[in-house]
Structures are given as structure tokens and as C-alpha cells.
């Protein structure tokens, strides 16, 4: 989630597995560079219940290779997904995994970026099984927030029960 000046929020952030994960001693959280107050109203609008934290004012996102400053971008290439990437934006997708041991120490154990993240997008998983596949002109060009599809009522959510 970038600062709302750009008014952009990734449409893929909709997690329904949190309860299952919690019973496996796993916590799923999202981290955004924007100040917390800038994305809490959006979180409520989407009906999202996962923990969402702000890294505003810290280097957290840069430390894990998903945020880049203007000087890095002006150089023509940034290190993203463990390789030089000439067409990166200021914010790029990524997921990192951490382990907290019984002593309370936290260890970074895994990160995935770009195409390594599509396994987390169940819509893509289902589309990949179909004859037309993803049927995209550009990556995720078809994806909308759940309340921005013409046929969806404003109260609809990707995890709500459909009425028949």
C-alpha cells in the first residue's frame, strides 16, 4: 500500500485463510509504507480482517527489497527479486516469512517476489486450470477490488456467501 497520494491499493489483498493459519501457529500480516491512518478506512471498506501495519518512517520495505527511492530508480535499475530490474516501480510486490523462537528472537527465513507470489492468488490458481487460462493482455489487467465490479453490490466481499 503506497501513500494515498497515488491512491493505489493492490487488488489481490483479500485473505480468507487467517483462522486456519492461526491454528498452525502462523500469523499473516500486511505491511505498508503509508501512515496507518491513510489505509484504515480502505481496510474497513474492503471488510478485511487481517492485521495490517505501517512501516512509515522506517526502512523495513527497503530492507526487504520491495520499496525503492527516486535515486535508485533514476539509476536505471534496482535489485529486485535477486536480480537487476530496469523497469521497477517505487513499490513492488513481495512476501517475507519470519520465525520467532521461544526466546523472542525474530529471524527472516524466506522471501518471494513477482512470479513467486502468484501461487498465493487463488483466483490465478483456478484460472490456470481453465481452457482460457489467465486470458490477460497485461499482468492483472482484469482484476478489480471486490466493490468495483459492475455486477457486485457494494456490500459484497470475495469471502461472502453468494445468494442463489
Q: Where would I find each of the regions flagged by the language model?
A:
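Short His-Asn-centered micro-motif
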Residues: 28-34, 39, 55-56
